[in-house]
UniProtKB/Swiss-Prot annotation:
FAD binds at G10, G11, G12, H13, A14, G15, V122, S177, Q366. GO terms for molecular function: flavin adenine dinucleotide binding. SUPFAM superfamilies: FAD/NAD(P)-binding domain. GO terms for biological process: tRNA methylation; tRNA wobble uridine modification. NAD(+) binds at residues 269-283. Its main location: cytoplasm. The lineage of its organism: Bacteria, Pseudomonadati, Pseudomonadota, Alphaproteobacteria, Rickettsiales. NCBIfam families: mnmG_gidA. InterPro entries: FAD/NAD-bd_sf, GIDA_C_N, MnmG, MnmG-rel, MnmG-rel_CS, MnmG_C, MnmG_C_subdom, MnmG_C_subdom_sf. Belongs to the MnmG family. It comes from Rickettsia typhi (strain ATCC VR-144 / Wilmington). One of its GO terms (cellular component) is cytoplasm. This is tRNA uridine 5-carboxymethylaminomethyl modification enzyme MnmG.
Length: 621
C-alpha cells in the first residue's frame, strides 16, 4: 500500500515550496502534478518580486525556500523598485528567463531528498471521521497519507475567456480540475469565483524598438538569495511604450465583446492588476497607459507586454496592438485571455493553513483567494512546514504580523477573508519599517533553524553573516572624527567638540554609506550589504524603537489564547451581533479577535475579563 506523510497536489509556486519544505523536515513527501516539466511554471508575467512581493521572496529564502535561489539562477533583468524612497518600501524585482526558471526548479526538485514526484491527476480526497486518509487519482489508484496540501492555482473548474469563447482550462492548453472542486463542495467548503488575466504575447523580432523607451536594469544586480554570492546570468534590457487615443477608441467600441463586460465572467478580478478594458473604463480621463515590454528569455524572442491584460476577441487584440508605438507591425504569438476559477473563503482555514473542517487538509496559494507567484509561494512554504510538523507531532510554525509579510498576508486572509484576488502591499503592514527585504533572514532564519527546516549550508552562511554584522558594528562604533574635522570636510554637525562615530554620522539625513567609505577607506573591505543594513538601522533608530514597543504590545495579545470551546453567548456584556461574529470567525487569540471587523474595544475587554473569571489560573487551554 502506497503511503506518504504529506502529499502536495499541484506543482505551481505554492506546491513546490510546500513540497520542498516538507521534505527538508525529513517527512516522506509526494508532489503530484499534471506535468512535472512545468514545476514552478510562470503562468503570467516572467518576473519575480516587486514592491512588498520582493520582501515575500526574501522571507521565503530566509526559511530555505526555493524561489529566491531559482530566480538568481534565471534572472535576466534586476531592478530595485522605489529605491528613491524609504527602505521600508524598497522592492527587489527580477525578470526571469521563463524556460530557464522552470529548468532550474525541475533540476532541484527531482534531486530533493525525501521527495517523490508523480505525474498524475487527483480526482478526489478520501476523508474518514473528518480527517484526511488518502488521495484518489483519475485512474482509480488510491495513495494513503497523513496530510494533504492543496495548491490548485487557477485549475479548480477553470475557464479561459477570449471574447465570447469559453474554454475549459486551468492554464492555456492544460485541462482544469472538476473533481477537486466537487470534493470541496461535498465537504461543505464555501466556494466562490475569482478572475485573473494575461496579455497577448508578441514576437520581439517584429517590434520597432526605436519608438520605445529603453529601461535598463541595475548596474550591479542584487541577489534575492543569501546562498547567491553574485548574479552570473547575462543581463538584458526592457522597453517601455504606451497606449494611444486610437487604442482607447478601439477598446471602447468593443467593450461589449470583452468577456469582462459582456457578463460572461462572474468572478471578480484583481483590483491592482486590472485589464486594459478596466483601465479605459475606470480611468476614462487618462490619455495613455504605460506598457512594459519584457523579454521572456535570453534565447526566446517572445515579449510579454505588461499592462494590456485582456479578454477581448483575438481579432480586436490584433487590431489594438497595431495602434501602440513600436508595435505597428508586431506579430501576436498568442492572444491574451481571462481565466475564471474556484477559490475557498480563506476564513475556512487556520493560521497554520490547515482547514477548520478537515484535519490534515491544508490550502495554499490561489485557492485561498490570493494572486501572484510570491503570495502563493509564501503560503506554500508555511503549509508545507506545518503539514510536516503535524506528521512529526510537533507544535505548528506560526508567523505573525509582527515578524513577517507572510504573517501579515495569512492574518489578513484568515481574519478578514477576501472577495477579490488578494495582493501583498507594504501598506498592509503596520510594522513595515521593521519588516524590510534586507533583514528578512535576521528575522526568520533562526526560527527556521529551530524547527529544522533550514539546511546546514544556510545555517553556516547565516551564522557567518551574524558574526560579520557584529564585527562591522564594532568597527563603525570605533571609527570616528571630531566635529571640527568633520566640518572641514563639509559634514555639518553640532560643534560640541565630541567625537562622532560612523553610526552617529549615519543618523544625519544627508549622510550615506558612500560618504562613510570615502572618509574611512577601510570600509571598502566590508560587506556592502551589511553596511547598508547597519546604515538603515542607525538612520531610523528612533522610529524603530517606537515600532518595537508597538510590536511588544501586539505580541502580548497574540499569545493570549482563546479556548476553542469558548461559548461567546455566555458573555452577557457583548451584543448578539458580536457574539455571532466571534462564533463564526473562531479567533484563536485576543489579537486576532481585535482585528475582526466590527469587534469593539469594549467587547475585547469583556472577553479578557471573562477568560480571567472562567480560567482562574489565567490559562485558556
Amino acid at each position: 500500500m502506497l503511503k506518504y506523510g504529506v502529499i502536495i497536489i499541484g506543482g505551481g509556486h505554492a506546491g513546490v515550496e510546500a513540497a520542498a519544505a516538507s521534505a527538508r523536515l525529513g517527512v516522506h513527501t509526494l508532489l503530484i502534478t499534471l506535468k512535472p516539466e512545468n514545476l514552478g511554471e510562470m503562468s503570467c508575467n516572467p518576473a519575480i518580486g516587486g514592491i512588498a512581493k520582493g520582501t515575500l521572496v526574501k522571507e521565503i529564502d530566509a526559511l530555505d525556500g526555493l524561489m529566491g535561489f531559482v530566480i538568481d539562477k534565471a534572472g535576466i533583468h534586476y531592478k530595485m523598485l522605489n529605491e528613491t524612497r524609504g527602505p521600508a518600501v524598497w522592492g527587489p524585482r527580477a525578470q526571469a528567463d521563463r524556460k530557464l526558471y522552470k529548468k532550474v526548479m525541475y533540476q532541484i526538485l527531482t534531486n530533493y531528498r525525501n521527495l517523490d514526484i508523480l505525474y498524475g491527476k487527483v480526482e478526489d480526497i478520501q476523508i474518514k471521521s473528518s480527517k484526511v486518509e488518502a488521495v484518489i487519482l483519475n485512474n482509480g489508484i488510491k495513495i494513503f497519507c497523513q496530510k494533504v496540501v492543496l495548491t490548485t492555482g487557477t485549475f479548480l473548474s477553470g475557464f479561459i475567456h477570449i471574447g465570447s469563447m469559453k474554454i475549459p482550462a486551468g492554464r492555456i492548453y492544460e485541462e482544469p480540475s472538476y473533481g477537486l472542486s466537487n470534493t470541496l463542495k461535498r465537504l461543505g467548503f464555501k466556494i466562490a469565483r475569482l478572475k485573473t488575466g494575461t496579455p497577448p504575447r508578441i514576437d520581439g523580432r517584429t517590434i520597432d524598438y526605436s519608438k520605445t523607451t529603453l529601461q535598463q536594469g541595475d548596474q550591479i544586480p542584487r541577489p534575492f538569495s543569501e546562498l547567491t554570492d553574485a548574479i552570473d546570468v547575462p543581463q538584458i534590457n526592457c522597453f517601455i511604450t504606451k497606449t494611444t487615443a486610437e487604442t482607447h477608441d478601439i477598446i471602447r467600441e468593443n467593450l461589449d465583446k470583452s468577456a469582462m463586460y459582456s457578463g460572461q465572467i462572474k468572478g471578480i478580478g484583481p483590483r491592482y492588476c486590472p485589464s486594459i478594458e478596466d483601465k479605459i473604463v475606470k480611468f476614462s480621463t487618462k490619455l495613455e497607459h504605460r506598457i512594459f515590454l519584457e523579454p521572456e528569455g535570453l534565447e526566446d524572442y517572445t515579449i510579454y507586454p505588461n499592462g494590456i491584460s485582456t479578454s477581448l476577441p483575438k481579432e480586436i487584440q490584433y487590431k489594438l496592438i497595431k495602434t501602440i508605438p513600436g508595435l505597428e507591425n508586431a506579430q501576436v504569438l498568442r492572444p491574451g485571455y481571462a481565466i475564471e476559477y474556484d477559490y475557498v473563503d480563506p476564513r475556512e482555514i487556520n493560521i497554520t493553513l490547515e482547514t477548520k473542517k478537515i484535519t490534515g487538509l491544508y490550502f495554499a496559494g490561489q485557492i485561498n483567494g490570493t494572486t501572484g507567484y510570491e503570495e502563493a509561494a509564501g503560503q506554500g512554504i508555511i503549509a508545507g512546514i506545518n503539514a510536516a510538523l503535524s506528521v512529526k507531532d510537533q507544535e505548528p510554525f506560526i508567523l505573525t504580523r509582527a515578524t513577517s509579510y507572510i504573517g501579515v498576508m495569512i492574518d489578513d486572509l484568515t481574519t478578514s477573508g477576501t472577495v477579490e484576488p488578494y495582493r501583498m502591499f507594504t501598506s498592509r503592514s503596520e510594522y513595515r519599517l521593521s519588516l524590510r527585504a534586507d533583514n528578512a533572514d535576521l528575522r526568520l532564519t533562526e526560527l527556521g533553524i529551530n524547527i529544522g527546516v533550514v539546511t546546514e549550508k544556510r545555517k553556516n552562511i547565516f551564522t557567518k553573516k551574524c558574526n560579520n554584522i557584529e564585527k562591522t558594528k564594532l568597527l563603525l562604533n570605533k571609527l570616528s572624527l571630531t566635529t571640527s574635522k568633520l566640518a572641514k570636510i563639509g559634514i555639518q554637525v553640532a560643534q560640541d567638540g565630541k567625537y562622532k562615530t560612523v553610526l552617529d554620522l549615519f543618523k544625519i539625513p544627508t549622510f550615506n554609506v558612500e560618504q562613510a567609505i570615502k572618509i574611512f577607506p577601510i570600509l571598502r573591505k566590508q560587506n556592502n550589504n551589511i553596511l547598508q543594513l547597519l546604515y538603515i538601522e542607525a538612520k531610523y533608530a528612533s522610529y524603530l524603537t517606537r515600532q518595537y514597543a508597538d510590536i511588544n504590545l501586539f505580541q502580548s495579545e497574540e499569545i493570549q489564547l482563546i479556548p476553542k470551546n469558548i461559548d461567546y453567548f455566555k458573555i452577557p456584556s457583548i451584543s448578539l451581533e458580536i457574539q455571532e461574529k466571534l462564533s463564526y470567525h473562531k479567533p484563536t487569540t485576543i489579537g486576532v479577535a481585535r482585528r475582526i471587523s466590527g469587534i469593539t474595544p469594549a467587547a475585547i475587554m469583556a472577553i479578557i475579563i471573562y477568560l480571567k473569571t472562567k480560567y482562574s489560573d489565567g490559562s485558556s487551554k
